[in-house]
Structure formats: C-alpha cells, structure tokens
Amino acid sequence: MKKTYHGSCHCGGIRFECELDLAEGTSKCNCSICTKTRFWKALVKAEAFRLLEGEYVLVDYQFGANAIHHLFCSRCGMKALGIGDMEELGGKFYAINIACLDDVMEEELAQAPVTYEDGRK
C-alpha cells in the first residue's frame, strides 16, 4: 500500500515528500556512482514526488550516457535523489535515496524487497 514519506538531506536544505510502497521493491545498482555512494533506491513516478525545499541547493552530476541526473546537496554533499526519463521504466521518475527517508520504519526497510541491478554493463 502506498504511503506518504518525507525525506531530507543531512543538513535539511533539501526536503521532499513522495508516495511509494516499499513492498513493491527497492534496488541497488553496481554502477560506479551507486557503488561508491552505497545508493539504495526506490523509484517514484514524477506525479508522486514533491520537492518541498532546496531547489537552490541541488547540484546536478551526470556521467556516461547522461541518462540520470544525480542530485546532491551543495551544503552537506548528500545524494538525496536522482531523476531520469526512460521509456522502459514508464517515463519520468525519481530515484529516492532510502537513507534520506525521515519517517520510514526499520521494519519497513527490513521487509522491503531488494533487486540488484547490473549497472556496469
């Protein structure tokens, strides 16, 4: 069942909310940036994401095919989310850093299915 989660970066400069169901699955990728940042994500459709604060502190980083906008806080360095637009994933989406969800319960994290993606190919 979808639930509204609130999230933020470490310093609070970025604040967002999103509608997601962690039971539908999360993922971890082995591409270079996800490996180095230990990014554990949940994908959220564009209409289910709201940036509440922080557009002015977001820094965009892209590499490789420039398919994903990796967004970091310019103050604390936290990678809070990514933005992509891929037909195979249903169009525009937000990749939410699970670690940035402020009101997620430990039980929800323990029960969330994790898919491992091969992002190195």
Could you say what each language-model-derived stretch is?
Residues M1-S8, G13-K121:
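A short Gly-Trp-Pro
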